Amino acid sequence: MASGVKVDPSCKNAYDLLHNKHQHSYIIFKIDKNDTAIVVEKVGEKNAPYAEFVEEMKKLVEDGKECRYAAVDVEVTVQRQGAEGTSTLNKVIFVQYCPDNAPVRRRMLYASSVRALKASLGLESLFQVQASEMSDLDEKSVKSDLMSNQRI
């Protein structure tokens, strides 16, 4: 079911800077107050740690009463098969945060609008985290899930 919410062009521009040019560490998106467009709400500085992203999400979701989307550049360390030592890689993940105590209408609007954002930005192939509480964004568990679901 499509919601009719459009993706603002600033979302694509910000995502290109994150994904292709690595100028940001994360982008937090929200549906605007008129429920007509998905817009960029916050952009993280280039080398901002994952913990900063989580702290910003906590501030923006008003004690778990609001939903958000995010694209986050996550750094992971891997042991490559047949190689000595480890390698550090960056992977962009997509986060859909919809807490259980957000109003039902907001949760439904975010759920029905996510497809438009993913299609507009080309996010379909990204690893996705669906979070309903802040603990779902724990850095260690997100990285562990990312590594177990990706072929690197």
From Swiss-Prot:
Keywords: Actin-binding. GO terms for cellular component: actin cytoskeleton; cytoplasm; ribonucleoprotein complex; striated muscle thin filament. Residues 4-147 form the ADF-H domain. Belongs to the actin-binding proteins ADF family. The keyword Secreted does not apply. PROSITE patterns: ADF_H. One of its GO terms (biological process) is locomotion. Depolymerizes growing actin filaments in muscle cells; required for the assembly of actin filaments into the functional contractile myofilament lattice of muscle. This is Actin-depolymerizing factor 2, isoform c. Pfam families: Cofilin_ADF. It comes from the Eukaryota. InterPro entries: ADF-H (IPR002108), ADF-H/Gelsolin-like_dom_sf (IPR029006), ADF/Cofilin (IPR017904). One of its GO terms (molecular function) is actin filament binding. Coiled coil: none annotated.
